[in-house]
Amino acid sequence: MLKEYRTVKEVVGPLMLVDQVESVSFDELVEIELHNGEKRRGRVLEINKDKALVQLFEGSAGINIKGAKVKFLGKPLELGVSEDMLGRVFDGLGNPKDGGPKIIADEKRDISGIPINPVARNYPDEFIQTGVSAIDGLNTLVRGQKLPVFSGSGLPHAELAAQIARQAKVLKSDSKFAVVFAAIGTTFEEAQYFIDDFTKTGAIDRAVLFINLANDPAIERIATPRMALTAAEYLAFEKGMHVLVIMTDITNYCEALREVSAARKEVPGRRGYPGYLYTDLSTIYERAGRILGKEGSITQIPILTMPEDDKTHPIPDLTGYITEGQIILSRELYKKGIMPPIDVLPSLSRLKDKGIGKEKTREDHADTMNQLFAAYAQGKQAKELSVILGESALSDTDKLYAKFADAFEEEYVSQGFTTNRTIEETLNLGWKLLTILPKSELKRIRDEYLEKYLNKAEESK
């Protein structure tokens, strides 16, 4: 029989202090019954002798200290998981949000998950085709990788997230592909955009959506990504699926952490965020990967908005340390109408060389990727020089590089949010753009590939 406590001592923001408790453990699930019979949930955040600090998921509004009854349920916050979750929409705490029935769970899992033994990890080396040339061709996503998108306020990261979720697939694999989508602190319009896009395109049949709205309690945001990852782990490691987890917006998650930290009166770290922000983010990002002997995998694309477009802000800064690269959206490209506005030069996928090449994408992928990077960088330099000195100061070769940079942005990077390019189409487009430059400038591509692919590209112009 569970004990019922009427010893609530204090409620501050999203936190409740309960006195005279016995046999309570960290992270234990708590049920709070209000004086009017309403029930809310929370979890134990800290224990000090006979006092327990409880974090409230549904907020503290309307709680009367004298009339509240508290029960400690003896288990952590869990999610009931089943393959029937595919095609469904849930709120940030795993309750159905689409008007459908509750899921009949195959099992219940602690949302904190179990760390993957480093020795049991399998190395990511299989190409995932997103259909977006700037990612597939230049910053390749590999199965089991964690590759964040660094965006800015007002940039179209929601459209890019929906496009990747809709188009992504593992080539040359018979295993099922699923998408787990977590919207953290999004507006109603943005959440509805995702639901409508998934439903309209049929992508929802292979997707699980967790939606935490901006007007939902901030504390729910701390649970939402863990709910999504718990569902992903079940589908990947129990059902053998390749699971792509897209989480937007991690910045809102970190703001919720800061709110709890401030309520606990902890010593703040950089910009007021808690000193354990790095450790906390790692408990989310490190749940990506592959396990030896298991067919499935979890690939993560966390999306975050950089406050004031600042890459040195603690959230993108710490995310960059934990993850394996970053895709950066550019406000300059966005103003030019380049969609998606992916800035390929500062973007990076640290595992891209493991997922490309013969029998994965195509033999010429690495060489063309290096050449496109180099040519675009030189083209941007030439354009900057022409602004300062005038176009007449450029050599004929520099003018060609400037022309290449414009064509690269308009044709290669810009493809809209509905075009789904195969890796063959992306590579062939790269070769077509390289024909703008003299053959003598293509020094990063082997002669055998120049003979095989360059002539074809010139003929197709």
Swiss-Prot record:
One of its GO terms (molecular function) is proton-transporting ATP synthase activity, rotational mechanism. PROSITE patterns: ATPASE_ALPHA_BETA. InterPro entries: ATP-synt_VA_C (IPR055190), ATPase_a/bsu_AS (IPR020003), ATPase_F1/V1/A1_a/bsu_N (IPR004100), ATPase_F1/V1/A1_a/bsu_nucl-bd (IPR000194), P-loop_NTPase (IPR027417), V-ATPase_su_B/beta (IPR022879). Pfam families: ATP-synt_ab, ATP-synt_ab_N, ATP-synt_VA_C. The keyword Cytoplasm does not apply. Produces ATP from ADP in the presence of a proton gradient across the membrane. The V-type beta chain is a regulatory subunit. NCBIfam families: PRK04196.1. This is V-type ATP synthase beta chain. It comes from Clostridium botulinum (strain Kyoto / Type A2).
